[in-house]
Curated annotation (Swiss-Prot):
Underlying gene: virB8
Intervals, Cytoplasmic compartment: 1-41
Alphabetically ordered keywords of this record: Cell inner membrane, Cell membrane, Membrane, Transmembrane, Transmembrane helix, Transport, Virulence
Annotated protein name in UniProt: Type IV secretion system protein virB8
Organism: Bartonella henselae (strain ATCC 49882 / DSM 28221 / CCUG 30454 / Houston 1) (Rochalimaea henselae)
Keyword Ubl conjugation in annotation: no
Pfam family, any one: VirB8
GO biological process: protein secretion by the type IV secretion system
Periplasmic topological intervals: 63-234
Length: 234
């Protein structure tokens, strides 16, 4: 009898130990699952946070992109004179187009007035006259006349004077400065280069002119005063 009771007591002890083991195992599994859930919540929160930061960064870059533009340009160097010129693109604004048109007419005017080639003399004289006011036409005609010793007809005769524009600057809305150099090629092919600065007072007028003249000066560009002086190169 005592032996049976002892055996039963030992069996009960083992069952209790087994139950404690099961309880501890379940508690461990529950704690582990709870920890995994916490880590998953933290990982999901970090994922959402990084996602929001990425979206915010992309929006910031997209907002700043229009403010930062790359404008390519070309630098051109004249091999004979060493003059450096920047070739830029034309921007799509009305003021830039207006200035570009004025620069075109100013350079055309200076080339025709200061350059000389006997075969083009008549054409250039007419062009300068069409782009000048009546008062400036009169001054130009007197200066260009054959009885004036300073006339390009008497100075250059059979030589060729070529004008190369270096820069064009707006001093005011109706005053423009043209820097250029003049290359005079003599009959023996010797070349002389001199540097000059021209100042032009200009405006655009709506004058009644012929269809042929309108082809030369379609917008009514007109120079009212003109002067050209040697430029001192240091």
């Amino acid at each position: 009898m005592k032996h049976s009771l002892r055996t039963l007591w030992r069996l009960r002890v083992k069952i209790n130990e087994f139950n404690e083991y099961i309880k501890e195992a379940r508690s461990f599994d529950i704690d582990r699952m709870h920890g995994m859930r916490q880590r998953m919540r933290i990982a999901m929160a970090l994922t959402v946070l990084f996602g929001l930061m990425t979206i915010a960064l992309a929006l910031a870059v997209a907002a700043l992109t229009p403010l930062k533009t790359v404008e390519p340009f070309v630098i051109r160097v004249d091999n004979s004179t060493g003059i450096i010129e920047t070739v830029s693109a034309l921007k799509e604004t009305p003021n830039d187009y207006d200035e570009a048109i004025t620069r075109y007419f100013a350079s055309k005017y200076v080339r025709a007035r200061e350059g000389f080639q006997l075969s083009e003399a008549e054409h250039n004289f007419r062009l300068v006259s069409l782009l000048s006011s009546p008062e400036e036409q009169s001054r130009f005609a007197k200066w260009y006349a054959g009885n004036n010793p300073e006339s390009p007809q008497n100075i250059y005769q059979n030589m060729i004077a070529t004008v190369t524009i270096k820069s064009i600057s707006f001093l005011s809305k109706d005053l423009i400065q043209v820097r250029y150099y003049k290359t005079v090629r003599e009959l023996n092919d010797k070349e002389n280069i001199s540097h000059w600065v021209s100042i032009l007072n200009f405006s655009y007028i709506n004058a009644q002119i012929s269809t042929q003249d309108r082809l030369i000066n379609p917008l009514g560009f007109q120079v009212s005063e003109y002067r050209s002086d040697p430029e001192v190169i240091q």
